[in-house]
């Protein structure tokens, strides 16, 4: 009997040893408490994320550490861990944890080991939104912010549920060309456009896998179309027709001013390659950045009075306007509504983007100009289309430039470009919005090793947009089409 009792005691002791070694965190004598939140990069403390987003991996701002131990546990259950030079969570475990805690929160405990000491910081929370983000990923343009030369410009896409990035079309495939203004139809990449500047330039229109290059410049319109936006029915594309110029500052804190000597708005019928024009959108004023309403009945755009640019660049004040559009007849209305008057308020309103549920209109506000990515004071604002009331999105803005933005398919998430980190490089941030218009703290697009990635990848990210599925574009076919110089010409309806 004593023998069995001894065996039992030894078994219990063995189990306790195993638990101590593998199941319980060690508590060294030199464990200290910082009494503060950890200084992490990116700053994910208090952000709201969708379930199934890529893991919120993070680094300590101070690189002088030996190891970081992180435990993440959910308010509705589940726990995952990471040990290493930075917080690097397993993707499958992370997705399971976020799904389990949809509508709840995940609490992070961070311990840092350095020079034989271990410091534990105060816990912080990340909230998991009840709103899904079902889109597959993001598309965006990557460009060196050097201005004088194009460099390796490219249109890329990113699976937001993992860390995988794919090139759609880059300058290495089609040398010497500048790609811009890529636009999917309400996040659906079965309808997508892309503009190419330079020799042999044109507009690529892809519908259900068929690629067509169109020359949108005519004797009447003076220039090719750009800044495009699809009509929700998928047959029309609104575009601006303009000339783009740059001026550089010396001896000031400003670097560049982008301006247009002329700018008008048109609509292309992609079925017939006909341009639909209106005398109300081809005036001496500069009309720019068109965007259709969620139901396609209105076309929003910005308009500024002509002035002598670049000398009078500070006088460029854009108003936010709209005009009716009849998709069945392919006709514009006869009245322009001015929603926000730039000269009266001494502000500039550009880049209007209506949510796909018809509730909100997001736009940029700055003190001048029609190219907000170059304005340090550019901020995001939100108009309630039910009431017409507008407010600044203080929850999302910073003391640096916020500019290009777009909505997720369900209109509960938006992505935008921001220079908040250093005032020079635009990076992509995501935030949620609820039914009352409350916006969450934005979070930087996750990367596997974020500090290494963002410090070494010296690109600016702009023109972000969501896509519900992966963009399928044949780059080899695009190369052939670019250099065969065959373009379908448009005509005026």
Protein language model features and the residues they cover:
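Sequence signature of WD/YWTD-type beta-propeller architectures
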Residues: 24-493
């Amino acid at each position: 009997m004593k023998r069995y009792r001894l065996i039992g005691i030894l078994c219990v002791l063995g189990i306790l040893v195993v638990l101590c070694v593998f199941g319980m965190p060690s508590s060294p004598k030199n464990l200290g408490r910082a009494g503060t939140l950890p200084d992490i990069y990116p700053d994910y403390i208090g952000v709201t994320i969708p379930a199934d987003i890529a893991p919120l991996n993070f680094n300590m701002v101070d690189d002088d550490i030996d190891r970081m131990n992180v435990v993440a546990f959910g308010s509705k259950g589940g726990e995952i861990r990471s040990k290493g030079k930075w917080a690097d969570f397993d993707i499958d475990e992370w997705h399971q944890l976020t799904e389990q805690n949809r509508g709840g929160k995940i609490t992070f405990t961070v311990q840092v080991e350095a020079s034989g000491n271990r410091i534990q910081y105060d816990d912080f929370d990340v909230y998991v939104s009840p709103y899904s983000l079902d889109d597959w990923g993001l598309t965006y343009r990557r460009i060196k912010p050097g201005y004088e030369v194009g460099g390796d410009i490219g249109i890329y896409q990113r699976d937001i549920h993992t860390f995988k990035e794919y090139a759609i079309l880059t300058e290495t495939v089609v040398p010497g060309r500048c790609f811009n203004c890529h636009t999917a139809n309400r996040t659906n990449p079965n309808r997508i456009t892309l503009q190419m500047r330079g020799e042999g330039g044109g507009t690529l229109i892809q519908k259900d896998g068929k690629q067509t290059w169109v020359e949108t410049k005519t004797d009447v319109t003076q220039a090719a179309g750009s800044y495009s936006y699809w009509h929700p029915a998928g047959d029309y594309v609104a575009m601006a027709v303009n000339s783009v110029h740059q001026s550089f500052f010396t001896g000031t804190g400003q670097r560049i001013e982008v301006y247009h000597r002329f700018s008008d708005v048109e609509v292309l019928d992609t079925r017939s390659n006909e341009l639909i024009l209106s005398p109300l959108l081809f005036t001496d004023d500069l009309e720019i950045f068109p965007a259709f309403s969620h139901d396609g009945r209105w076309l929003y755009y910005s308009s500024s009075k002509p002035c002598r640019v670049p000398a009078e660049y500070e006088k460029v004040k854009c108003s936010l306007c709209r005009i009716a559009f009849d998709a069945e007849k392919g006709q514009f209305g006869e009245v322009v509504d001015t929603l926000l008057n730039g000269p009266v308020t001494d502000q500039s309103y550009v880049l209007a983007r209506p949510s796909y549920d018809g509730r909100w209109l997001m736009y940029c506000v700055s003190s001048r100009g029609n190219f907000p990515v170059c304005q340090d004071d550019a901020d995001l604002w939100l108009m309630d289309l039910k009431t017409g009331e507008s407010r600044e999105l203080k929850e999302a803005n910073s003391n640096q430039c916020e500019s290009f933005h777009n909505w997720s398919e369900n209109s509960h998430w938006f992505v935008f470009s921001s220079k908040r980190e250093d005032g020079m490089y635009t990076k992509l941030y995501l935030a949620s919005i609820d039914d009352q218009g409350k916006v969450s703290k934005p979070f930087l697009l996750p990367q596997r090793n974020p500090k290494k990635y963002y410090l070494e990848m010296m690109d600016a990210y702009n023109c972000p947009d969501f896509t519900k599925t992966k963009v399928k574009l044949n780059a080899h076919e695009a190369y052939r089409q670019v250099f065969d110089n065959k373009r379908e010409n448009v005509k005026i309806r």
